[in-house]
Amino acid sequence: QPYVELGARARAADNENATSGLLYSIANRVSYVCGFTGPSLAVDTACSSSLTALHLACQSLHTGESDLALVGGVNLTMGETKSHFLAKNNFLSSDARCRSFGADGTGYVPGEGVATLVLQPLAAAQAEGRNIYGQILGSAINHGGKTNGYTVPNPKAQSALIQRALDKAGCAANRIDYVEAHGTGTELGDPIEINALTETFRGSGSSCAIGSVKSNIGHLEATAGLAGIIKVVMQM
């Protein structure tokens, strides 16, 4: 059964261990066991959760609040309630196949997974002889604001966000040759994402490939962003 239900029942029974099943305990249990004393928080921004956590971790490193950060995500399907909801609202692929940016895409396929990245300032990582698999030059987060629907993305906001991340990274659009996209395989979301990318890269004078790990392992929802980063690092 979903842990949220177990937690609710335990609290109702006045069980002192009820806190172990709440969202915040995911991060704070790690800090407790490992003896970490820096910021410890669980982030819930739906499908962008793990990337939002990554952004917040970068900020903590930039300000000197932390000298090393663990950014993790986990997505497990513990019951059938979510599947019923997604099917009822036509979110799911009709044949259980995720076709990111495919003309015959009919919806997304939920996936399960766990992902973790270790972040550290570059100079410190080099001084300590760490294995460095990638470098984050810039990150940004925003919200789509008012759109045609609560779950409908805003291409203008997406384009502005991409441009802001490029600006923070000091990187021109024509230097980008691959984008790991959200690419859920939905008829609504994929075209909007393509429009946002087109707006950002129009006039750059170069071509840019796009892809999404969701066609390989499904949509890891809260963990999807980290899964995409790990894919890119592994294919470099």
Predicted segments with their positions:
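Condensing-enzyme catalytic core of the thiolase-fold
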Residues: Q1-M236
